């Protein structure tokens, strides 16, 4: 019967903590036991544990260890049996005391552990404990102070050996790349393994069982031998001679038996050696095959590794490309966000600008309406002012002599005003030169008409007196005269030329031409009729113009018409005003159609509906009702010598024109046709010349504008000629110039060139 002596070393833990135990199995080898305990203390030095020392001893009630060997207890006296057992107990107690002294104080551990000191005599017991230990317990085998790795139990070892042998005998060519054409065919060598597979497996199992049996036998023999040696020292002291002889005889017989057994073992070992050489040769051949396969596998792995490295490089490049793409995408996303915010801001600004533009457009419309009203008021005031001035002049003439109502100039004044009758200041009419010059006297621009010697001094004086007596807002007023040769008459200067140059298309190349709208034409007709009616109402005899044509109608800055060229037939006996009425009717047709041809009157008389077809489109969209009435009045005036219109006077014409003008003003105030076409005609007509483009001297569009000291821009040739003639004053202000240096006006020149380009484009389209 085996007995286990234990000695438990415990250290009380803190209250409430649980003490776990570490079981350390020790044997009779003290040094080996010390190493095992030292390993356990080092492993759990910082953990509270309780150490339990285990010592296994074979104590049986039926057998006892004596110097003669293991004998039955019945063959030994009771006294000797007690002595032997007491000696064994003392030896174990001394051994445990040494272990306890070595341990010292230890701390408890929360897990149970079992440690076995490994020695040759404890191998089989260790395996037994390992196989039968509970699952919650950890098991360690310590040999020489170091942990020994454990193998599985015998059954697991057998199955593992079978599995290992099966893998070893399995054809590894199946796991290799079958596509390789250089591999050796493993069928021949594998067939020998297949044939000997079971035999080799049995051989290895036999070796394993023999090793375990021999180890156990050896352990038992060694243990018995050690025990016999220890016991023999004490037992032989109590034996007599006969017992000692019997003991020697038994030992001799045991030696003989041992020799026979060893002889048999030699034979068995020789057979086992042959079988081992046979197994080794098979294993060596198999190892060679495995090495060849391993080499092929290594080469294949190297190729796969190279391919893998190449793929990794491609993957890295792809990753880098993706990262760059992500970075670029992130940048584009940020840029898109910035652009989106800018677009949003611009859209908001655009919305605000559109709202502001609508507001400005409304304000512009209101301002245009207000400007038109102010212009109308200005025209009315100007006409009233002129009328008042004329009345004052007429009143003064009736009381004083001729020279008291106007001024007489000397020939030198006239030469200075006209720059000695320079052709540059000579005025044209319909492209033909006239005997009228533009001049400047006393800071006032005047028109100087050269009479020459065509009239005698008496006739010239009578003409001057007559012109001075006749004053009307729609008649050109005389400003002075010169009785010295050449005789001259001075009239107020009309800046917009005559009606012919402004009305007819062939004459609109003049720089001073203006686009006359339909309501302006009605107003001009009414004002011309007013001036003509004033001439016809002179007492005692009416003054007949006799040559009323568009060239005899001059326009001032405000497009107010004034009649010129009258007074030549005032002393004749002719008192019939019908020629003037007929001429006025033709003038109305000119205003309506903007055409100047001899068959116009005949065509209109034959078919009055053709008037609507031949309306002047540059005048804007005529109201249908006004166009019909205006055309009917024109035909009626031009047909005064035919039918029942013999007594049609200017007074009646004035009444009808007054009604037509009232309707025209009403249309214009309502903003009907006129506002719908006025902007289009202003934008599309290339003849509407900005005043800033005109040279103040030549009254033509400048080609090379230069700025003088007075701040005005002039044509270079004109201002140079002005300065070369000795003038040191401004042509516009008549003030002294501080210097005569001229500066090119590039900005104005660029604007003029752009204006010419637009005119050419509009003309080509």
From Swiss-Prot:
EC number per UniProt: 2.3.2.27
Record field: catalytic activity: S-ubiquitinyl-[E2 ubiquitin-conjugating enzyme]-L-cysteine + [acceptor protein]-L-lysine = [E2 ubiquitin-conjugating enzyme]-L-cysteine + N(6)-ubiquitinyl-[acceptor protein]-L-lysine
Residues given in the record as ATP binding sites: 428-436, 449
Residue span, Protein kinase domain: 422-765
Entry keywords, A to Z: ATP-binding, Coiled coil, Nucleotide-binding, Transferase, Ubl conjugation pathway
PROSITE patterns found in the cross-reference section: PROTEIN_KINASE_DOM, U_BOX
Gene Ontology process terms (BP): protein ubiquitination
Single Gene Ontology MF annotation: ubiquitin-protein transferase activity
Residue span(s) of domain U-box: 688-762
Coiled coil start-end: 198-391
Entries under Gene3D superfamilies matching the protein: Transferase(Phosphotransferase) domain 1, Zinc/RING finger domain, C3HC4 (zinc finger)
Pathway: Protein modification; protein ubiquitination
Function: Functions as an E3 ubiquitin ligase.
Family: Belongs to the protein kinase superfamily. Ser/Thr protein kinase family.
Entry comment, domain topic: The protein kinase domain is predicted to be catalytically inactive.
Record's protein name: Putative U-box domain-containing protein 50
Species: Arabidopsis thaliana (Mouse-ear cress)
Gene this protein is translated from: PUB50
């Amino acid at each position: 019967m085996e007995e286990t002596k234990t000695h438990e070393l415990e250290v009380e833990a803190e209250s409430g903590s649980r003490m776990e135990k570490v079981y350390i199995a020790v044997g009779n080898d003290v040094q080996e036991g010390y190493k095992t305990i030292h390993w356990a203390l080092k492993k759990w030095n910082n953990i509270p544990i309780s150490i339990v020392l285990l010592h296994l001893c074979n104590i049986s009630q039926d057998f006892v260890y004596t110097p003669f060997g293991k004998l039955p207890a019945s063959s030994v006296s009771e006294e000797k049996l007690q002595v032997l057992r007491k000696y064994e107990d003392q030896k174990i107690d001394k051994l445990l005391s040494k272990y306890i002294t070595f341990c010292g104080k230890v701390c408890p551990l929360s897990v149970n552990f079992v440690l076995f000191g490994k020695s040759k005599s404890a191998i089989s017991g260790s395996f037994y404990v390992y196989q039968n230990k509970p699952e919650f317990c950890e098991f360690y085998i310590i040999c020489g102070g170091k942990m020994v790795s454990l193998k599985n139990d015998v059954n697991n070892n057998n199955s593992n050996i079978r599995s290992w042998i099966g893998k070893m005998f399995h054809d590894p060519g199946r796991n290799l790349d079958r596509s390789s054409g250089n591999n050796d065919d493993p069928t021949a060598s594998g067939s020998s393994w297949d044939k000997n597979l079971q035999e080799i497996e049995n051989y290895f199992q036999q070796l394993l069982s023999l090793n375990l049996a021999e180890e156990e036998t050896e352990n038992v023999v060694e243990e018995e031998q050690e025990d016999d040696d220890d016991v023999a020292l004490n037992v032989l002291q109590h034996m007599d001679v006969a017992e000692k002889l019997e003991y020697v005889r038994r030992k001799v017989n045991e030696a003989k038996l041992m020799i026979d057994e060893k002889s048999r073992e030699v034979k068995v070992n020789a057979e086992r050696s042959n079988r081992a050489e046979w197994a080794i040769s098979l294993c060596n051949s198999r190892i060679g095959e495995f090495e060849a396969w391993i080499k092929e596998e290594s080469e294949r792995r190297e190729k796969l590794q190279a391919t893998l490295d190449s793929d990794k490089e491609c993957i890295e490049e792809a990753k880098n490309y993706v990262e760059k793409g992500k970075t670029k995408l992130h940048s584009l996303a940020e840029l898109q966000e910035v652009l989106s915010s800018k677009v949003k801001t611009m859209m908001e600004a655009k919305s605000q600008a559109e709202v502001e533009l609508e507001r400005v457009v409304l304000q512009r419309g209101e301002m245009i309406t207000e400007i038109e009203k102010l212009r109308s008021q200005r025209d009315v005031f100007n006409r009233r002012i002129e009328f008042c001035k004329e009345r004052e002049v007429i009143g003064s003439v009736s009381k004083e002599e001729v020279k008291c109502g106007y001024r007489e100039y000397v020939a030198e004044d006239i030469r200075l005003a006209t720059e000695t009758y320079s052709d540059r200041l000579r005025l044209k009419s319909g492209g033909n030169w006239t005997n009228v010059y533009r001049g400047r006297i006393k800071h006032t621009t005047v028109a100087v008409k050269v009479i020459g010697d065509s009239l005698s001094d008496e006739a010239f004086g009578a003409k001057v007196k007559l012109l001075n007596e006749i004053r009307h807002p729609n008649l050109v007023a005389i400003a002075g005269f010169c009785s010295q040769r050449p005789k001259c008459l001075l009239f107020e200067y009309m800046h917009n030329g005559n009606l012919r140059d402004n009305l007819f298309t062939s004459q609109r190349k003049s720089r001073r031409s203006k686009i006359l709208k339909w309501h302006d034409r009605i107003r001009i007709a009414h004002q011309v009729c007013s001036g003509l009616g004033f001439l016809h109402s002179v007492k005692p005899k009416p003054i007949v113009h006799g040559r009323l044509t568009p060239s005899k109608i001059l326009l001032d800055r405000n497009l107010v018409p004034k009649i010129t060229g009258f007074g030549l037939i005032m002393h004749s006996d002719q008192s019939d005003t019908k020629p003037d009425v007929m001429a006025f009717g033709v003038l109305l047709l000119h205003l309506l159609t903007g055409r100047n041809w001899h068959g116009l009157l005949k065509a209109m008389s034959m078919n009055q509906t053709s008037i609507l077809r031949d309306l002047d489109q540059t005048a804007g969209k005529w109201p249908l009702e006004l166009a019909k009435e205006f055309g009917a009045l024109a035909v009626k005036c031009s047909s005064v010598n035919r039918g029942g219109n013999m007594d049609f006077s200017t007074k009646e014409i004035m009444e009808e024109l007054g009604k037509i003008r009232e309707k025209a003003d009403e249309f214009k105030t309502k903003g009907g046709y006129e506002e719908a076409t006025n902007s289009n005609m202003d934008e599309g007509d290339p003849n509407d010349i900005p005043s800033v483009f005109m040279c103040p001297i030549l009254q033509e569009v400048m080609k090379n504008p230069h700025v003088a000291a007075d701040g005005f821009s002039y044509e270079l040739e004109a201002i140079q000629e002005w300065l070369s003639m000795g003038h040191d004053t401004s042509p516009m202000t008549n003030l002294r110039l501080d210097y005569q240096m001229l500066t090119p006006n590039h900005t104005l020149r660029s604007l003029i060139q752009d204006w010419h380009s637009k005119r050419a484009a509009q003309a080509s389209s």
